[in-house]
Amino acid sequence: MPELPEVETVRRGLQPVLEGARLTRVEARRPDLRFPFPERFSERLTGKTITALGRRAKYLTMHVQDGPVLICHLGMSGSFRIETDDDGETPGVFHHERSKSTAHDHVVFDVVAADGARSRVIFNDPRRFGFMLFAEGSPETHPMLAGLGVEPTGNTLDGVLLASLLKGRGSPLKAALLDQKLIAGLGNIYVSEALWRAGLSPLREAGTIARPSKKARQQSERLAEAIRSVISDAIAAGGSSLRDYMHTDGSLGYFQHSFAVYDREGEPCPKPGCGGHIERVVQSGRSTFYCRTCQS
């Protein structure tokens, strides 16, 4: 499933085409994805100007003038692609063959920019776990977004805040970090990478780094910094291309080439002087990768 860096990469890819453009045609080619499309879906968007394209956690938000806010989730395999009048490959940009059948093109947005340039934005989702819903008013009050926790970007998430979120929690540290009500947008890949950078075991009790001790304060600060840096690095690399994820132009993200532990079972730990090896364990049905030698 695309995580926050992948969704942010998609947002940045769509933004130049969608923001300020007018929706001249909106076509939903089936009645539902994971959920049914909102009533009068096409009618309520057609003719509207897109004022902003935002992101909250793993959700995209499309704001239109005098209309509802469209909330979109990519699900397991959802992706957008952009088609223009000039669809030649951009020099210097890596492209790969699309493996997805156009039979899974479920939503089409035709837009015209202020300068008259026309584009088509297509949502493709083979597994149909993605969805599009309307928020009337602020999207922050929509049930899908209302309970989300702090964003792991910028400097909001620091050691003090992280310790307050984890205080008293007896669940494994990795499980607590995946709780979207605490920190919004973190997923399996980047939690594993952040815990390795911070030198903390995913198996340890979450509340142990929130104790009133110097060591715990250092651990919470180290983990907060690791979370922020992993997310920032992944966004800069365009996300991680695993299985279904691709950019809006069909190119791949590259952060997977920087993985220290994720999907590297049996390999030597890359931390200098460690000497350990990456192990895989299953937590709550998900694979966890870590080094027991340098993560405690």
UniProtKB/Swiss-Prot annotation:
Stretch forming the signal peptide: none
Homology family: Belongs to the FPG family.
Free-text comment on the cofactor: Binds 1 zinc ion per subunit.
Required cofactor(s): Zn(2+)
Cross-referenced HAMAP family: Fapy_DNA_glycosyl
Gene that this polypeptide is encoded by: mutM
Active site: 2 (schiff-base intermediate with dna), 3 (proton donor), 58 (proton donor), 286 (proton donor)
Keyword field: DNA damage, DNA repair, DNA-binding, Glycosidase, Hydrolase, Lyase, Metal-binding, Multifunctional enzyme, Zinc, Zinc-finger
Quaternary context: Monomer.
Residues annotated for DNA binding in this entry: 104, 127, 169
Catalytic activity entry: Hydrolysis of DNA containing ring-opened 7-methylguanine residues, releasing 2,6-diamino-4-hydroxy-5-(N-methyl)formamidopyrimidine; 2'-deoxyribonucleotide-(2'-deoxyribose 5'-phosphate)-2'-deoxyribonucleotide-DNA = a 3'-end 2'-deoxyribonucleotide-(2,3-dehydro-2,3-deoxyribose 5'-phosphate)-DNA + a 5'-end 5'-phospho-2'-deoxyribonucleoside-DNA + H(+)
Protein function: Involved in base excision repair of DNA damaged by oxidation or by mutagenic agents. Acts as a DNA glycosylase that recognizes and removes damaged bases. Has a preference for oxidized purines, such as 7,8-dihydro-8-oxoguanine (8-oxoG). Has AP (apurinic/apyrimidinic) lyase activity and introduces nicks in the DNA strand. Cleaves the DNA backbone by beta-delta elimination to generate a single-strand break at the site of the removed base with both 3'- and 5'-phosphates.
UniProt keyword Membrane present: no
Protein name per the record: Formamidopyrimidine-DNA glycosylase
MF-aspect GO terms: 8-oxo-7,8-dihydroguanine DNA N-glycosylase activity; class I DNA-(apurinic or apyrimidinic site) endonuclease activity; damaged DNA binding; zinc ion binding
EC number, UniProt record: 3.2.2.23, 4.2.99.18
GO BP annotations listed: base-excision repair
Chain positions of all zinc fingers (FPG-type): 260-296
